[in-house]
Swiss-Prot record:
GO MF, one annotated term: hyaluronic acid binding
Pfam families named in the record: V-set (PF07686), Xlink (PF00193)
Cysteine disulfide partners in this protein: C61-C139, C181-C252, C205-C226, C279-C349, C304-C325
Residues making up the propeptide: 1-9
Coiled coil regions in record: none
Source organism of the structure: Rattus norvegicus
Domain Link: 159-254, 259-351
Localization terms from the record: Secreted, Extracellular space, Extracellular matrix
Keywords: Disulfide bond, Extracellular matrix, Glycoprotein, Hyaluronic acid, Immunoglobulin domain, Repeat, Secreted
Chain ranges of the Ig-like V-type domain: 38-152
Name of the protein in its database record: Hyaluronan and proteoglycan link protein 1
Lineage, top ranks: Eukaryota, Metazoa, Chordata, Craniata, Vertebrata
Gene: Hapln1
An annotated GO BP: skeletal system development
A single Gene Ontology CC term: synapse
Residues the record marks as carrying a glycan: N56
Amino acid sequence: MRSLLFLVLISVCRADHLSDSYTPDQDRVIHIQAENGPRLLVEAEQAKVFSHRGGNVTLPCKFYRDPTAFGSGIHKIRIKWTKLTSDYLREVDVFVSMGYHKKTYGGYQGRVFLKGGSDNDASLIITDLTLEDYGRYKCEVIEGLEDDTAVVALELQGVVFPYFPRLGRYNLNFHEARQACLDQDAVIASFDQLYDAWRGGLDWCNAGWLSDGSVQYPITKPREPCGGQNTVPGVRNYGFWDKDKSRYDVFCFTSNFNGRFYYLIHPTKLTYDEAVQACLNDGAQIAKVGQIFAAWKLLGYDRCDAGWLADGSVRYPISRPRRRCSPTEAAVRFVGFPDKKHKLYGVYCFRAYN
């Protein structure tokens, strides 16, 4: 206790002495760098980038080194890009680079490479974007024992649409739901995509699977059959269900297409089989549900004629609401899944560009 008291007295005396002799010239800012502080910093200039299917995009990533920590740079810099799964439980390898050695993984082969705009540029360029490329990517830079990461979200311009098959509503387990979207030129939507669609006005009272395995539905106009009339608008969450046994609808996402979507002018109405053949005779294929939604949402396609689609449903897209043509709102109108032998409808075709 005596030693401690003695030290305190010395400190007070020293402080008094400094106070008496202080001048403004003695005011200094002292920067102290911790011995174990960060010596490698990775940053993304943008947390989110936007593109569309078939386009090219640059995922930004730069790193900054402390030259005093790494000396002459005998450690080779390793750059690794991975994609985070929607549930954040796994990382999927995309691209790795170390010096002259580079490796690309899976469906990214031939489509990704480093921008290399400067010595500290780890930005990744992805070409010919697919619907599956949507998501969050992690840029990791490693030098010696030091490493740091940054995350960039890749958003795709597109449209979310609810889907159920001819069997009716609530008939798809998770795996069937994912395949159903693929069959309609789409992918199963993420929560973020559904949330953005809800903010854009999507209102749908049937619960559907999302890519993370959750079951949700968007409500902009609360009403009794859809969660209650006195509830607030929002994306209703049923939670996570058994992917094999539980059955719901699905929310799909699609984007721009490289082709022409059109209503085939034909002298007569068609059965389903006649509709398929009519498109083939015109050098095209019968259109898919994802294609009619993309044409409607992204191209403003408008046609007040009900037509067959590939899944056996009959629909028509209205961008300009009017009397007898979806008078209350712009929408892709759903007629149903009629008997394929009924000769009552036209057909929508799709011709891909080479």
